[in-house]
């Protein structure tokens, strides 16, 4: 609806269901659905954390992203020159006890939602297993453009993320809902984080994860968007000493070169999603 209301301002990615995973016609129905979405203007496809963590087949097994049944789907997305976005796994904090988590927002969220706190669900896959399965998909599909949502669920260490970006040239990541982890690492080692953004300036997309879920008034939502944008803009373009409710420690802005900031905030989205500039 947003795309229809403002096509010049809003682009969309689509998704597909796995609720009918064991239907013999699942593949053909999914391919037809994706083509209809592409014809309607979708610039990519997003897969969600339900794959690997929630959705199960009729035998009760978790559906995993590296299942061969997905191969023709990912191949088709690549042939149509579209992007696959992946919110796969969760932040590594999800597998840690609350007192060991690195950001206050994760601590609050998993404290309120123990059902999603994997530390309390030892029978569920580990963070390492889910990331390994994602990596196998990228190994099998080297020409597929992939944007890892939420820093590719490697938000806890830019060195680990850099290893994946080196290994998979068609992989990029967005920063949505993971600025707390960026702030935390900046407080620990600003130079390392700053160098990461400069070295991988063509592979990082700004995002917020903010949405209108009906819980806030329009004024509250607008204020939240403005506050987040101003905070993050200050972090990227100045060397100010800053504080954030996301972490307990002060940190210093990265003061990135203008050309890097322009890519992170705008140009990379145009390039990776094939948007009209």
Where are the language model's segments positioned?
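Active-site gating/metal-coordination segments in enzymes
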Residues: 2-118, 179
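H/E-rich (His + Asp/Glu) clusters that bind or coordinate divalent metals
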Residues: 118, 122, 127-136, 141-277
């Amino acid at each position: 609806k947003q795309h229809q209301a403002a096509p010049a301002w809003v682009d969309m990615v689509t998704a597909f269901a796995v609720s009918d995973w064991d239907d013999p016609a699942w593949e053909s129905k999914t391919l037809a659905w994706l083509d209809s979405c592409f014809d309607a203007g979708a610039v990519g496809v997003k897969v969600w954390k339900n794959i690997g963590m929630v959705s199960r087949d009729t035998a009760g097994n978790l559906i995993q992203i590296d299942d061969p049944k997905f191969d023709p789907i990912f191949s088709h997305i690549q042939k149509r020159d579209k992007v696959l976005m992946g919110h796969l796994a969760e932040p590594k904090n999800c597998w840690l006890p609350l007192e060991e988590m690195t950001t206050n927002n994760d601590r609050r969220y998993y404290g309120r939602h123990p059902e999603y706190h994997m530390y309390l669900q030892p029978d569920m896959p580990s963070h390492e297993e889910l990331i390994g399965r994602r990596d196998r998909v990228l190994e099998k599909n080297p020409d597929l453009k992939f944007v890892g949502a939420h820093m590719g669920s490697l938000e806890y260490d830019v060195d680990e993320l850099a290893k994946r970006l080196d290994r998979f040239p068609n992989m990029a990541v967005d920063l949505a809902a993971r600025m707390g982890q960026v702030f935390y690492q900046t407080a620990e080692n600003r130079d390392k984080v700053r160098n990461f953004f400069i070295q991988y300036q063509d592979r990082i997309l700004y995002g917020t994860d903010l949405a209108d879920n009906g819980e806030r008034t329009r004024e509250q939502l607008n204020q939240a968007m403005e506050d987040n944008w101003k905070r993050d803009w200050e972090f990227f373009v100045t060397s100010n000493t800053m504080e954030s409710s996301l972490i307990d420690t002060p940190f210093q802005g990265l003061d990135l070169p203008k050309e890097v900031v322009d890519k992170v905030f705008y140009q990379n989205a145009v390039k990776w999603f094939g948007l009209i500039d």
